[in-house]
Amino acid sequence: MPPRLEIQPQRSRVDEDLAFVITGADPGAILDIEVSVQDGALREWCSHATFRVDSEGIIDLRRQAPLPGSSWSGVDPLGPLWSMTPKDPSAFFTRTRAWALTYHAVIRHDGKQITETTFTRHFGDEVCREEVHQGPIVGTIHRPDDDQPRPGVILLAGSDGANLEAAGSLLAGHGYTV
């Protein structure tokens, strides 16, 4: 039976912890993990890491560091996410909306794919989004999906005109009206 890759939770907010665990692998084997995602401009970003399977046939990113030459070093369960780079090194990660991101994770042994899975990170599924156009005031309100009074946060974009949809949605998911 091939090794099994579990990423928990399968669906989570972008600021929640993840557990990447491979089980059922041959102790001492060297496995490669590649994680990829597309940004809002449909550019692919990816990270890679090489691990030695422990004596119990497990790789757990909460307990093990990747081998040298990986995208990150040290024990870091979120290393596969923050260490992603684009094929074009001058590119910036583009988010045009607060849509969920679907990641693809592949495990390889000796260059051959042995298992894969997908997982999703979102900015706040449980929020309402409302456009505001009142005279000279234009904006977007993000709020929890209930009618309870909530503390408010105002997000102001800088001179670059950055889109703050993701930040607004994420804060609303934590109980703020933004």
Sequence positions of predicted segments:
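Beta-strand-rich binding/interaction modules
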Residues: 29-35
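Conserved binding-pocket/active-site segment within a compact domain
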Residues: 141-142, 156-157, 168
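Active-site glycine-rich loops that stabilize anionic/oxyanionic intermediates
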Residues: 150, 157-162
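N-terminal cap/lid segment of alpha/beta-hydrolase-fold proteins
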Residues: 3-13, 18-29, 42-55, 92-151
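Glycine-rich phosphate/adenylate-binding loop and adjacent beta-alpha elements
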Residues: 75-100, 159, 173-176
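Hydrophobic beta-strand anchors of alpha/beta hydrolase catalytic cores
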Residues: 153-155, 178
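Ser/Thr-rich low-complexity repeats and stalk/linker segments
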Residues: 35-85
